[in-house]
């Protein structure tokens, strides 16, 4: 009988131990559950929104700091990851979609702002989402994209057999982002002078082309949220405008933040840092972040709203300079909160358009008050 009692005692201990373990969440599963929940929640509306984060390796941390003005005005403030790894693009998205948007060329008048200021003609390329022509008076959010060194207008739509355009088509088709207009622009005049120094001079001057010519030409032609192409109406519609770029296009994106925060709310700098002060090999990181912070504070951007999705590949040739700025910005959490700044990396990503495609795939659902969809929630074709 004693042996039977011993056996029963051992079994009882095993059962109790199993129940205790079952009651404790697995840390990895808990992190995944927390992040997935963040992806499924809607962002808050207006200037006090906190965009939902893409899936990251770590769970959201509790915010113990004093709430910002945007947080105190919001009914619900999400706790989201501020850093992590981006999610790979669904493999089939690089192939043509059933419902495909169209790309059209638009020629507009400008000036050679990096040169003698002479009048010139430039061409940009515009992606119109599927159904644009039949959508009546529907207005669309708009994203401007800038290429890197040696790049050209339209390259985002044509590189890799149109893989980036295909991703846009699929994301819109499956309800992961709202239909939007996308512009693939250039800081070059005609592409004849593409040495590095001239390229940097051109991107530094691009904001004048953007403000005075490109933006009015595009938004005076296509139906965006700007009531007209007037400067006042373009400023009034900043909540519906985004700007992103890769490599020197990332540098351009930071310049756009510095000059054109009155016109643009969402920013996507990919593989690059701010060169408002300094330049390549002279990365004045603290001085540039100090300046960005002063723009935020002096222009009430915390209340008005802005969001930066900063990204780089883990094997990118410009990772060091990008990380320097990210670390400096993340070290100022009272200014650059997760509602305003996030930094994500592509695992194994190098300096190419595959990384760009992944960053767009991760960032765009966070722009323009887009509702987040999981793959299961996306409408079927």
Cite the ranges covered by each PLM segment:
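Positively charged n-region of N-terminal signal peptides that target proteins for export
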Residues: 1-10
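C-terminal motif of bacterial Sec signal peptides marking the signal peptidase cleavage site
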Residues: 17-20
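Short, low-complexity, disordered segments immediately C-terminal to signal peptides
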Residues: 22-50
């Amino acid at each position: 009988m004693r042996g039977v009692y011993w056996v029963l005692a051992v079994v009882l201990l095993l059962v109790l131990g199993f129940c205790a373990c079952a009651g404790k969440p697995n840390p990895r599963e808990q992190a995944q559950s927390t992040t997935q929940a963040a992806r499924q929640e809607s962002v808050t509306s207006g200037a006090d929104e906190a965009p939902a984060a893409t899936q990251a390796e770590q769970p959201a941390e509790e915010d113990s700091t004093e709430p910002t003005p945007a947080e105190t005005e919001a009914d619900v403030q999400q706790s989201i990851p501020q850093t992590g790894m981006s999610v790979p693009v669904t493999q089939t998205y690089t192939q043509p979609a059933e419902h495909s948007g169209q790309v059209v060329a638009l020629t507009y008048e400008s000036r050679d702002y990096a040169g003698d200021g002479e009048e010139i003609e430039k061409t940009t390329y515009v992606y119109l989402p599927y159904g644009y022509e039949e959508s009546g008076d529907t207005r669309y959010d708009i994203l401007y994209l800038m290429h890197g060194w040696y790049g050209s207008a339209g390259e985002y739509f044509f590189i890799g057999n149109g893989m980036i355009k295909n991703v846009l088509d699929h994301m819109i088709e499956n309800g992961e982002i709202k239909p939007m207009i996308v512009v693939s622009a250039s800081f070059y005049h005609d592409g004849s002078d593409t040495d590095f120094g001239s390229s940097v001079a051109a991107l530094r001057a691009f904001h004048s082309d953007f403000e005075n010519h490109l933006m009015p030409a595009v938004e005076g032609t296509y139906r965006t949220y700007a009531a007209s192409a007037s400067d006042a109406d373009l400023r009034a519609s900043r909540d519906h405008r985004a700007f992103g770029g890769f490599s020197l296009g990332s540098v351009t994106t930071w310049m756009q933040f510095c000059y054109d925060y009155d016109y643009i709310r969402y920013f996507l700098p990919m593989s690059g840092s701010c060169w408002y002060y300094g330049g390549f090999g002279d990365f004045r990181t603290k001085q540039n972040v100090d300046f960005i912070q002063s723009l935020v504070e002096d222009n009430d951007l915390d209340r008005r709203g802005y969001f930066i999705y900063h990204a780089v590949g883990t094997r990118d040739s410009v990772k060091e300079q990008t990380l320097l700025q990210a670390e400096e910005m993340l070290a100022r959490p009272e200014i650059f909160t997760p509602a305003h700044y996030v930094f994500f990396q592509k695992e194994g990503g190098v300096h190419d358009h595959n990384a760009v495609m992944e960053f767009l795939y991760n960032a765009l659902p966070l722009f323009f008050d887009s509702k987040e969809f999981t793959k299961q929630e996306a409408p079927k074709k």
